[in-house]
Amino acid sequence: CSESEKFAHITFFLNGGTNESFPCESHVRIPSPKGVPFDQVPELSLPAVADEVIKGLETGYDCIITNFANGDVIGHTASAEAKIRCAEVVDYHLGRVIEAAKEQGYVVLITADHGNLEEMLTPDGKPNVAHTTNLVPFLFIDPLTSQTIQPADGSLQDIAPTLLNILGV
């Protein structure tokens, strides 16, 4: 589940460069806001994305993959106010999803492929609108132990094997 602005990140890219759904896979695309600058709607369509993910958790899918597009999309704007609001909105809706996942017994993995929102200004004091090279967190939340684990090292290449291991594949 993702909004349209970053939908390819959890479909086309994750499925090896194809737009086709695999058997037992469903794609949920929530339309991103149209006709308004993104810095004026830092929540984008996240409330609807989170609602859809929570519905999926209650349905009992084996695995749900989602993209909260806000940090990346709003991070490319020059508005500090929009970036702050974006972080607040993501925090709130991520909390909703994590609580629902825990209630349903899901393991939760949280990460990003790059930084963006965390640096408001460039070294010369201008608004930063580019990706950063800062390390991003990887959180593993286990509902059975109520533990959140944050490994000290790892990379994006470790995510798929970790997920497959959790799924018993």
Feature map (PLM): residue ranges:
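Feature captures the catalytic ectodomains and active-site-proximal regions of enzymes
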Residues: 1-169
